[in-house]
Amino acid sequence: MKSHGIVHKYGDNVDTDVIIPARYLNSSDPKELAKKCMEDIDKEFVNRVNLGDIMVANKNFGCGSSREHAPIAIKASGISCVIAETFARIFYRNAINIGLPIIECKEAARDIDAGNEVEIDFDSGIITNLTKGTSYQGQAFPEFMQKIMKADGLINYINEQLEAV
């Protein structure tokens, strides 16, 4: 599984309250959440993002309130992957559960700039910055998590397993 796109870059401690503000949590419709994604930190995000783009951040991405609305909003906005130095653990699990690929890599998170063209190979964990001609070794998903991601989330994965029985 691979992702390829243009980078949208953010700093440390991007919390779920700025990914999708609480005032929009009355909806669970991914399309509606996508329209408000990153609104409090980057007003132009929804106008700039294209299908397949990649979000890069520094430390503790997805901290704050536990809400699956945050990874849903990011995924529905068109982002194909989030790269960060570290993720808040609850965000990490929520992202996997809804099928949003994420990968931890300190060097990539620090070196990749907004606007760079990046490709990620999730099977190997290799992140390639096509703009700068550099590669980084990120943390590859364990096999069971790769299966969840390929199924586009935990619920789809479980349904596939049930259908196979």
UniProtKB/Swiss-Prot annotation:
Keyword Manganese (UniProt): no
Domain of life where this protein originates: Bacteria
InterPro entries hit by this protein: Aconitase/3IPM_dehydase_swvl (IPR015928), AconitaseA/IPMdHydase_ssu_swvl (IPR000573), IPMI_Swivel (IPR033940), LeuD (IPR050075), LeuD/DmdB_bac (IPR011824), LeuD_type2/HacB/DmdB (IPR011827)
EC number: 4.2.1.33
Enzyme class per UniProt: lyase
GO biological process per UniProt: L-leucine biosynthetic process
Catalytic activity: (2R,3S)-3-isopropylmalate = (2S)-2-isopropylmalate
Listed pathway(s): Amino-acid biosynthesis; L-leucine biosynthesis; L-leucine from 3-methyl-2-oxobutanoate: step 2/4
Pfam families: Aconitase_C
This protein's UniProt keywords: Amino-acid biosynthesis, Branched-chain amino acid biosynthesis, Leucine biosynthesis, Lyase
One GO MF term attached to the UniProt entry: 3-isopropylmalate dehydratase activity
Subunit structure: Heterodimer of LeuC and LeuD.
PANTHER family (alphabetical): 3-ISOPROPYLMALATE DEHYDRATASE SMALL SUBUNIT 1 (PTHR43345:SF2), 3-ISOPROPYLMALATE DEHYDRATASE SMALL SUBUNIT 2-RELATED-RELATED (PTHR43345)
Protein function: Catalyzes the isomerization between 2-isopropylmalate and 3-isopropylmalate, via the formation of 2-isopropylmaleate.
Protein family: Belongs to the LeuD family. LeuD type 2 subfamily.
NCBIfam families: leud, LEUD_arch
Protein name: 3-isopropylmalate dehydratase small subunit
The species this protein was found in: Lachnoclostridium phytofermentans (strain ATCC 700394 / DSM 18823 / ISDg)
Taxonomy of the source species: Bacteria, Bacillati, Bacillota, Clostridia, Lachnospirales
